[in-house]
Amino acid sequence: MKIRIIQNCYSTDQQEGCFFEPYWNEIPKTADERYLFFESEVIRKLIIDRWHADSDYFAVLGYRWQDKLWEASDRSRSLPIQNLSRDRLTPQGLLEFVDRHPEADFLSLGRFIAHPVFRLAETFHTGLMETTEKLLKAVHIRFDLRRLISQPIYFNSFVAKSHAMESFVSEILHPVIMAATEDPDLRKLCLRNSGYFRKFRPELAKLFGISYYPLHPFIGERLINLYTMEAGARVVSFDRSGGISRWGRVTASIDLKRRAFGWNWLSRGGWRI
């Protein structure tokens, strides 16, 4: 079994600290808004470029993936977004976790209680649900986000079977990112202030002409939850007991011949980069 895990990096120091294969996510020379999806855009690009093709499992993690999951386990956090996996997952532990669960299509590296993913996000990022609904409508995906109650995957902290990752990108991530950056009205919606508390990187502020984190990354990282639900994906969440399973609406492993949303962008003229 071959597992390929990429770590998304923005500096030399970050690259040097990576346990897994580093990927230099260079700031574009022009204001390409796809970049604002951050790790979700890296997933899209690498799948298009077939980085997953020779692997059984594939993942794109942030350079701080361990810290994010550990910080989310703080008991002072709001319960719905509190990581209930109390053990700090190590790189070796991650590989062993994947090896123990060959039945899973997706393996979440954290464990969160089930909650309405997009409705909760709206309380932190005003306008996120409305914008996501319009993006889905633009790519002909009909789904009531208010009824999406899921034990979620957060921070793009997941590993997937390579064919399942390709299905996710092909069916929802790629078309949504393209719609968000090509349609003038959708672009304006996505560029609104997300209300995220961290300071926007100065070099990005200069390039994109905004002083805040827009909605793009917070929409992108939540799409995996919509996909796993509709595809009937087998998802296992990391837990000190070894793993807790959940399934989408249909208890069937993902097959590239079976589409969660009834179509595949690969069959509609190929990828547009």
Language model features: what each stretch is:
Residues 1-273:
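ER/Golgi luminal nucleotide-sugar-dependent glycosyltransferases, focusing on the catalytic module
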